[in-house]
Amino acid sequence: MEFKKALGYDDISLLPNFSDISSRKELDTTTRISKNFNIKIPMILSPMDTVSSVKSCIKMNKIGAAGVLHRFMSIEEQRDKCKLIKDESSFCITAIGLKGAEERIRATSTYTDIYFLDTANGLCKNVEDFLRWYKTSGFSQDIIVGNTLTKESVYRLANLKADGFRHLIGPGSMCLTQMKTGIGCPSVTGNYYAWKAVRNWELSQVDLFKDDKPNPNNRPSILTDGGIRYPKDLVKAIASGSDAVICGRIFAGLLDTADEENIIEKDGKIYGKYRGMASRDVVEDYELYDGTRKNLFVEGESTLIELNKVDTIENVVYDFVNGLRSAMSYLGFRNINEMRGGIWTGSIQAVINSANNIYEGFAHGK
């Protein structure tokens, strides 16, 4: 049997195209994060309890990106926080789990524009049953489901009217899923699976005998979840099919993401907690284990990050979006839709790197 080869962000480099762009100010980074919702900057703050808060979600929303409020709180607290975010920044996105989903949705729907379903594996009966229920329940908010990884998972959930996908399993900086289970796929190839599945699904929705074309407004979004470390990763995520990226680590350790309960003083220094949502700390804090501690299974890590008193959410986001704009000018694309998936359509040329190329790409003059 011949195994398929899979590539990650560090495995490829993009080649420039002819460009008639005279200024990066001409470029539009607006993207869709669900069927009915756009943002101006294709970056989403992950619903992790050590970076996602009312203040961080409001800041992300106000600068044109998006923050997703995490779900690990009482229903009443989540409702009140959703209201604060909605009132301060005009829209709110929040996470829900499968357990108790209906009660949470009913409590928060007045103040919520998009729901993110928090599940490790979107290719399962429970997720499909939930999505069938949600789409017939009368709620109007878009629903992002996942996590997906294969073409099958994306296509099946698209058929059930998902408005978008949290895509990829295992690339997050605090995620141990690939190490613990062997499940995962490098990000560029993983993004291709979602891009191809959505393209196939779009074609299945048109009547070819009437010479119809796919309706771009009916397409579910692809949101790459994890693995984003540098602006180049955002660029390559979009070039390989993503609409936007979901990030946690790049926002960890900032004063405007760390809530007071997640700040620790140690040896005269101030640290912020940062942890994966399947880490031992989270599983124990929220009692997510099954009956006894013997059934506690951990697929994430926890760490302390010295608080960065200089950088802000705005600085981080603008650094990434400026890198994206620069890449768009090299590639000759004026908007995200032109660029998205260009590796697969042939509008972007990519080369496979040698093992040593990563060192050339970093500043190395010191």
What residues fall within each predicted segment?
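Alpha/beta catalytic cores of nucleotide-metabolism and tRNA/nucleoside-modifying enzymes
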Residues: M1-K25, G182-T224, R229-K366
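Active-site entrance/lid segments in N-terminal catalytic domains of soluble metabolic enzymes
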Residues: M1-D212, P216, S221, R249-L254, ...
